[in-house]
Amino acid sequence: DYARELARSALDAMADGAYATPSGRQVNWSDDIERAKALKMSIRADDPLPTVEREPFARTIVQVRNETTMQAAATFVERGARPLALNFANGVHPGGGFLQGARAQEEVLCRSSALYATLAGDPMYDDHRRRPTPDSTDWMILSPDVPVFRSDDGISLEQPWLLGILTSAA
């Protein structure tokens, strides 16, 4: 299945620190992956929120658009913004079912970026697995600079771009 192949090739690209573009060029993104992993913050439900520098905005515009998370984020990045995408995540399995070829939002994010590298091994998943009830907490994982290397349809990009992703169990 194509989605499963994309998941395997994403894992290979992360492990190799490089991927091939449609033009045949090799893109070394190992530094981007390591930076994404180093910047990741696991925020327990009772942890204080990290402080951030706020930027004033002249106005807020709300739009409803028929786009995927990646399409919308790419549009904002092209306009010079730094979007933060909400990953509606599986609370017990990093990447949800992306390795099995599932096709929900989290799985597409993991197939198209190095998000999985920032989620794998996070203590949130073990904590949720140990819960006596089949639910999750408000624990979140902030991955502020995840390199995106593919479009939603699986086409490798000539140059990766960075996306902030907030992972929260849905």
Predicted regions and their residues:
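Macrodomain-like recognition of ADP-ribose-binding/processing modules
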Residues: D1-A170
